From Swiss-Prot:
The keyword Nucleotide-binding does not apply. This is Nuclear receptor-binding protein homolog. PANTHER family: SERINE/THREONINE-PROTEIN KINASE WNK WITH NO LYSINE -RELATED. Its main location: cytoplasm. It is found in: Cytoplasm, Cell cortex. May play a role in subcellular trafficking between the endoplasmic reticulum and Golgi apparatus. The gene is Madm.
Length: 637
């Protein structure tokens, strides 16, 4: 395909990712290929939005949302009262102030309380028009264009690396760009996942108000998730250092899922003003999460994060670190040691002391801490089975999300026989699901495993990316809305089901190809482009991968689908029937496409309206030669 054809073809195609079970009003509209779909937020983060007040009227009772490196949570939060007192106020907060250069992100007037996170100047709630969900619009403002230029390369490196992160315990980073429209106030804007359930600091304050002690099991589960995220960051090449880990920058969901932000503040923005703020923080004792060597070291190291984690673990265990006396708010070494001594569990004290070792070279790594006697455990067969069920590649590709949920419901009934025991007298005894204690919580347990509440720490986790420099510069917005395209991302989601159709227009004989993709996160994607007799399936597929619409590992599978569609609709006798406008549709499931190297059979059925082609592995055909629709999918014109 020529460049001109590419521009008029897939690069100009209609793209829509929309949730299957969302309200139609939330369905995504068409989006230009210049702003490719980013990985949608995990299902666990799409909670009911909190009550948020404008920053101009925010007080100690306001709740918060967060992006990467943006702290959510303020003291005395009241989750039961709404600060919105009238419909007019709500309409004002929903007013759109500006949009991203690609038009996908819409910044609202509604601001989010960010507390004292270094480097972040302004945080607004925003709408992702493609996914139909709320996100966070973060702004870092620079004193001058010269200052931005001096930090741009370092900023680019950090943000380019953050775009590649994919961990269920790390707040998702979606996009960034620079804006130099106002030379006297240049800025960097980045879009992050919206966390609505508040910070860990908020939760600890509420727990302390209720005079409750945090159970050791909850403490262990939180520490495991935080260390899993830190181990992932530190295992990147080069390593990513958090640099601002506190209980204010750790966020907890309603189901116990913990996430941390991942921006290094000094790499985002550093100026004289930031230095003065840091000195004020030291004066009021807010620096106690920072290691003794912080500021003196030439380069941030993983040991800094380990020290900060130790302070977080101590605050989680004690609920609060009280100052030495009521007249001072400073937290010193004596206060820390007294708080550690107040803990009852010896192993808990040992783990925290190792993290707070004054010598950075003697502190354990995040991975080493996962094997500490207090955190390490031999995973139960129940947990291993749940991970196999949820994350096994075979299970993720064999069924769509809906089919998988239906399969779970089929076997999750009280009268389902789980085991059968033959007794000595020849009698048989059946054990049903209703006989198992805690069976009513099994479905929730599997859901928690899916969302990352129970990671496997004794096995190698998800391999972090090896970062490389990007050839493209970050997007620079010269106006509120610019035609400059953003850097194209690679698609990280896999295809579960796919369908392709071609249709010839009666008046012009132009061939329109439409590709429907169902991704592994319940999202549908529709791609439409014009093709001609010179276009090949290989060229079309390569362009889909290059533009970030298809995962690289799915390239061969979708190429076969396109080849069969073009063959059936254009090169065969069925092309004549196409002129009637009926079209040709080809459908394939990932389960079938995964077996390309095996023995295939292609079932074709042509009628007067058009032709339909479906891929079906032989083992999925029954004795009569019919297709098991539940496994292979359906075909329609």
């Amino acid at each position: 395909m020529s460049n001109s054809q590419a521009n008029a073809g897939i690069s100009g195609s209609t793209v829509a990712d929309e949730p299957i079970q969302h309200h139609p009003s939330l369905a995504a509209g068409p989006v230009s290929a210049s702003c490719p779909a980013a990985t949608p937020p995990s299902q666990s983060t799409q909670q009911p939005p909190p009550h948020i007040v404008s920053a101009s009227t925010a007080d100690a009772g306001s709740s918060a949302a967060v992006g990467v490196g943006v702290v959510a949570g303020s003291e005395g939060v009241n989750l039961d009262s709404s600060p919105r007192e009238s419909g007019d106020d709500s309409e004002d907060e929903s007013e759109i102030l500006e949009e991203s250069p690609c038009g996908r992100w819409l910044k609202r007037r509604e601001e989010v309380d960010q507390r004292d996170v270094p480097g972040i100047d302004c945080v607004h709630l925003a709408m992702d028009t493609e996914e139909g969900v709320e996100v966070v619009w973060n702004e870092v403002q620079y004193a001058s264009l010269q200052e931005l230029k001096s930090q741009e390369e370092k900023m680019r490196q950090v943000f380019d690396n953050l775009l590649q992160l994919d961990h269920q315990n790390i707040v998702k980073f979606h996009r960034y760009w620079t804006d130099t429209q106002q030379a006297e106030r240049p800025r960097v804007v980045f879009i992050t996942e919206y966390m609505s359930s508040g910070s860990l600091k908020q939760f600890l304050k509420r727990t302390k108000r209720n005079a409750k002690r945090l159970p050791l099991e909850s403490w262990r589960r939180w520490c495991t998730q935080i260390l899993s995220a830190l181990s992932y960051l530190h295992s990147c090449s080069p390593p990513i250092i958090h640099g601002n880990l506190t209980c204010d920058s750790i966020f907890i969901q309603h189901n116990g899922l913990v996430k941390i932000g991942s921006v290094v503040p000094d790499a985002v923005h550093y100026s004289v003003r930031r230095g003065r703020e840091r000195e004020r923080e030291r004066e009021r004792g807010a620096h106690y999460f920072q290691a003794p060597e912080y500021g003196a070291a030439d380069q941030l190291t993983a040991a800094l994060d380990i020290y900060a984690f130790g302070m977080c673990a101590l605050e989680m265990a004690a609920l609060e670190i009280q100052p030495s006396n009521s007249e001072s708010t400073a937290i010193n070494e004596e206060t820390i040691q007294r708080t550690i001594f107040s803990l009852e569990n010896d192993l808990q004290r040992d783990l925290i002391r190792k993290c707070l070792n004054p010598q950075p070279q003697d502190r354990p790594s995040a991975n080493d801490l996962l094997f500490h006697p207090l955190l390490f455990e031999v995973h139960s067969l129940k947990l291993l089975t749940a991970h196999c069920l949820v994350f096994s590649p075979a299970n993720r590709t064999m069924f769509s999300e809906t089919a998988f949920d239906g399969l779970m419901q089929r076997y999750y009934q009280p009268d389902v026989v789980m085991a059968q025991l033959r007794l000595a007298g020849g009698q048989e005894r059946q054990y049903r699901l209703a006989d198992v204690s805690g069976a009513d919580k099994l479905e929730k347990f599997v859901e928690d495993v899916k969302y990352g509440v129970y990671p496997l720490i004794t096995y190698s986790g998800k391999k972090p990316p090896n970062f490389r420099s990007r050839a493209a510069s970050p997007e620079r917005a010269d106006s509120v809305k610019s035609a400059t395209p953003e850097p194209v991302d690679t698609e990280s989601r896999r295809i579960v089901n796919m369908m392709c159709s071609v249709k010839i227009k009666e008046d012009s004989n132009d061939i329109t190809m439409t590709i429907l993709l169902r991704m592994d996160d319940k999202m549908n994607r529709q791609l439409t482009c014009q093709v001609n007799e010179n276009d090949t399936a290989a060229d079309l597929t390569s362009e889909l991968v290059r533009l970030g619409f298809v995962h690289l590992d799915d390239q061969d599978k979708i190429q076969v689908l396109l080849e069969e569609t073009l063959k059936a609709g254009v090169m065969s006798d069925g092309a004549g029937a196409e002129s009637s406008g009926a079209g040709v549709t080809t459908t394939a499931t990932m389960a079938a496409l995964e077996q390309l190297e095996r023995n295939w059979s292609i079932s074709s059925d042509a009628d007067k309206q058009g032709t339909a082609v479906m891929y079906v592995p032989q083992e999925q055909q029954n004795a009569d030669g019919d297709v098991d629709v539940e496994h292979s999918g359906t075909t329609s014109n």
